[in-house]
Amino acid sequence: MSQPTHTSQMLRSLLVSSRRCTGRGLFMDEAACVRQQHRGLDSADSHYDGLYPGHIPTNPIQKALLAVGSGVAALQDPYRHDMVAVLGETTGHLALMTLRDRMRGDPEGYTILTERPRIRLSTLDLSKMASLPDGSFGREYLRFLEDNRVTPDSRVNVKFVDNEELAYVMQRYREVHDLLHTLLGMPTNMLGEVAVKWFEAAQTGLPMCILGAALGPLRLSTSRLEPLVTSLGPWAVRNGRQARCVLSIFYERRWEQSLENLREELNIEPPPLTIRATSQKATLDS
């Protein structure tokens, strides 16, 4: 099958399914529809239309449907990273352009856009990172991965961004997320994730981050909401606004740098609270 024919058939399939979705119940069925579309489109991951591998072209109507459906699914389950990813890609065009321009205006960010590094297990020297002294950025990042039982390979590839350079900016944001957890001293429990989202919302302006920052607190208990509102939230927003563009840092060349020194360079204050990775409970620093 020729490449244009394959793409046309895929788009027609998307449009037909989107028309079917609009005729059903709005909220419950749109989440189901976007999951159905996403599964159907996954088979096109290996397709290369000339923009970048795995790109899936969509028109504005299809993007809107995907945005609404993935948003509903993400609200129902914030740990549905595939739905969060679709929401970010279908709503973030303007914010991605701003982030791209900030990276272009920074020498280190420009180098990143030119060299296109990836943060994956295949690109990390875990043995070397484990040998670094405590307090170094690389050692603390590895400790974060171990303590929270996460892996950089869990970040899915971008599919729905219709610009190759902006697609990389989104991918870089996605792969830098766990590094931000390390920089901010936040675990991956709900309180830690919401605090990071408040930082990201102020730093990136991505609609997905703003939505997560606004709605994430609704999933917190009263005891966990109090430290967010009185301490973690204001700290996260303030630092998100004042920090250097976090996408413009070549973290792969900073593993040996001390975490404290890197925070100072980025103009990020140490967290006001210590949150244990094994518990949702926040405790004040002594």
Sequence positions of predicted segments:
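Polar low-complexity intrinsically disordered regions enriched in Ser/Thr and small residues
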Residues: 26-28, 72, 188
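Generic secretory/membrane-interface signal
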Residues: 23-24, 36-39, 71, 166, ...
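N-terminal mitochondrial targeting presequence
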Residues: 1-54, 286
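Compositionally biased, low-complexity repeat tracts
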Residues: 19-21, 36, 46, 50, ...
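Leu/Val/Ala/Ile-rich N-terminal alpha-helices, chiefly Sec-type signal peptides and the beginnings
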Residues: 36-96
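Core of folded catalytic or high-affinity ligand/protein-binding domains
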Residues: 76-264, 268
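A generic alpha-helix propensity feature with a strong bias for hydrophobic helices
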Residues: 60, 110, 273-275
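Charge-dense, extended regions
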Residues: 260-285
